[in-house]
């Protein structure tokens, strides 16, 4: 024992020197990669500014944005990873337009490959990526979207009734964040895999998705008992569950039955091919379905919450929505909103698009540099850098009075969605642009139309209630706390 202590004592100066040398090299490496772009001159050793990010994501990213105000980009350091934040729209386009093996790789999350696994749609390139996107085309035809619309309305109505019933006649406020999340999770389950999840599987699914949500916001410590590790294992279980649904759907479609949900439209096309296309095994389909779920679930939760928030603060907009919907659809008809009626709700659709512009759910789209990439004449992004193009910042560039919530910017007269198309990046750009954006927009339009027509609502305002928080997509700080009451004599009966 004395001998061991003696050896340690003799080695201690060398160990301390080696550790200090490591810290020095780490700082010098950061400064070398940072070069002349804005960013902290010193970063905490090893973990960088990860603690600041996890403790208060909003302040962290706001600071990155303000630091990049003049140059269009800024630097930082997170758990051994050099990062570059991109505020300027044209610089962001350089990232989105160069997603390929020898430039940038979309990762979806700073530690996405650990969390999602390697076999994921967002990591595909070239023919593999094109093949899978072609497979997805039948999922978003007019016939498919019409099927989803009916399912969406049934789920939305059921949840709106439950929300109103839980408020004691409108005398008690409710926070909508968790309620909207539950609505969207049931919508995703119903639309994506319909009849293939029984009650027990749905409950397991809900538990695993909540574990994933918590882990996606945690430090990437992949050990038992840590949220990130639990999230990674939950993703695997979710993919397996969805893979089982894919197998059941294949059997049903092979028997010639009619599609009833998204996986049916997908599998109907696959079983018709001989031989079956690449990446069409049950397990791979399950992983791809999880990609859809991840893309749809939290993004829609964010958009629905901001829709309620913004409609409450803009009574004129709310009145115009109600007037338009009332001319097209009546709850007393007990009829679902048809796709033709949905297409007629042009102002309501403009409101939905403005909600997405004004508060894009996923504010950044992380990529990793596969090479040293010359971004500007004076700065080259080093290989291995995690790059964060900010679609949030782009939404406030170019547009007329961008800080103002103004749905009319998307009218047929002004057409700012075309004039400033390069700034509207909420659905991405380039080869990995969101394949389900029509579905997502329809979901938001249906929710706005039904929520505003069936319910009266008023925010319980508090200090900072409209501030942005990340969970993991953005939402109002107060969770959108509202008083709810029914504004119709009776709810429609869609049965």
Swiss-Prot record:
It holds the Pfam family p450. It is found in: Membrane. It catalyses: 5-dehydroepisterol + NADPH + O2 + H(+) = ergosta-5,7,22,24(28)-tetraen-3beta-ol + NADP(+) + 2 H2O. Heme binds at residue 434. Disruption phenotype: No visible phenotype under normal growth condition, but upon infection with P.syringae, no accumulation of stigmasterol and increased resistance to the pathogen. Induction: By infection with Pseudomonas syringae. Keywords: Heme, Iron, Lipid biosynthesis, Lipid metabolism, Membrane, Metal-binding, Monooxygenase, NADP, Oxidoreductase, Steroid biosynthesis, Steroid metabolism, Sterol biosynthesis, Sterol metabolism, Transmembrane, Transmembrane helix. GO terms for molecular function: C-22 sterol desaturase (NADPH) activity; heme binding; iron ion binding; monooxygenase activity. GO terms for cellular component: membrane. Pathway: Steroid biosynthesis; sterol biosynthesis. The chain crosses the membrane at residues 5-25. Its EC number is 1.14.19.41. This is Cytochrome P450 710A1. It comes from Arabidopsis thaliana. The gene is CYP710A1. Belongs to the cytochrome P450 family. CDD domains: CYP61_CYP710. No activity with campesterol. It comes from the Eukaryota. Its cofactor is heme. It is a single-pass membrane protein. Its main location: membrane. Expressed in the vascular tissues of roots, shoots and leaves. Expressed in root tips and sepals. Very low expression in stems and siliques.
